[in-house]
Amino acid sequence: MSLKIIHTADWHLGQTFFGYDRDEEHEAFLSWLIDILTLRQTDVLLIAGDVFDVANPSAAAQRRFFRFLREANRHNPQLQIVIIAGNHDSAARLEAPIPLLEELNTSIVGVVPRTDLCKIDFDSLLIPLYNKEGKREAICLAVPYLRQGDYPASKEGKDTYVEGVTRMYRQLYDYADSQRQPGEALLAMGHLHATGAELSEDDRSERTIMGGLESISVEAFNEDLAYTALGHIHKAQRVGGRESVRYAGSPLPMSFSEQHYHHQVVAFTLENGCLSDLEAVPIPLRTALHRIPAEPASPAEVLLSLSNLPLAEEGADRSLWPYLEVQVLLTEPDPGFRHRVEEALADKAVRLTSIIPSYPKKEGEEDSRPFSYTDLQKIAPLDMLRHTFTNRFGGDLPEELEKMFNDVMREVSL
């Protein structure tokens, strides 16, 4: 028999984008996803964390989530949904409605449960997956975002985060392997930063771990796992050259650095315990992101480009207007430039999000490199401010700003 599965992650319901809510975008995605689940007669939906954008999501975001679960079940009553918590989610809040959601064939793992003897309850992390005939086809190792202390301790009791998380997946795999029947597949879920995961150069939507101190090697996931469904990184990709270890990516771009990501869900089949028919299913984008101009240009050139944008039509749906980031090349700070941009866009069918200034490099100035973890331990805060100011504005830090910074440092040191 076979099991049809779809993997998604990083919905970030309730996110605001530079002050604009994204309700219509999320609603369009969820409606599309229900159609895909129904059309493909999907047996299992895996949601690999960051359902919500914040730990205390709005009532509207929670309603949207619960309404999706209800509608997905109504269109496909046999659909099984497995959800793990991400670092943006409140694990306890996500688990709170479990008694009700069990009626919708939905399993949620937010926290790592422990037994009365304070050992990890591995059974609670194993979710059986059934085919349309009600036969168990696979076992899912549903591991939520792990924090310090969530993973099994070593005998020495001195673990790095990477060692602890790796031990968690290996021990859980061994336990699940002992519980499965012949022909049953094992698959895993996780919300973490995997070693070698690709990001765009200016991606700041998820915290980049300094020096890779908390990135998990693909070797943590046993090669006999039929599939590993990951969340946390917003760029859809396979990891470590293994087709079966994947980030689904976010359904919406969470920042302008993600505007060229291929937003998708991953569909695949488990056939007699083996992975087959793996396919990336593109998600239609409701609202576009535009950077104008494509490269920073002078204020006059920027304003000329903005004047050529399409006019707004009376009664138009503003939620369909593209988000706009303006890039300008300045020789010195220009406090009035934003006002001129806003005037130029007053009758245009776009939504201004930000104006990003850049400054020409001084002659002989080399490209700056990011500070390493060791650098950050050695550099003084004032030196960091001076370095950042010079890189951003091309000049020395003004004395009045240095004085203000020193005053603040004295206050926080009291």
Predicted regions and their residues:
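Conserved beta-sheet core of the metallophosphoesterase superfamily
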Residues: 194-274
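N-terminal active-site segment of His-dependent metallophosphoesterases
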Residues: 1-70, 74-78, 407, 411
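Metal-dependent catalytic neighborhoods of phosphoester/phosphodiester hydrolases
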Residues: 18, 51-68, 85-104, 110, ...
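Active-site neighborhood of phospho(di)ester-bond hydrolases with catalytic His/Asp-centered motifs
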Residues: 8-9, 45-49, 80-87, 107-112, ...
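Active-site neighborhood of divalent metal-dependent phosphoester/pyrophosphate hydrolases
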Residues: 12, 42-60, 76-92, 194-212
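Accessory, non-catalytic peripheral segments of nucleic-acid enzymes
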Residues: 270-414
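Active-site environment of divalent metal-dependent phosphoester hydrolases
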Residues: 14-15, 53-56, 85-95, 147-151, ...
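Conserved catalytic scaffold of divalent metal-dependent phosphoesterases
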Residues: 104-211
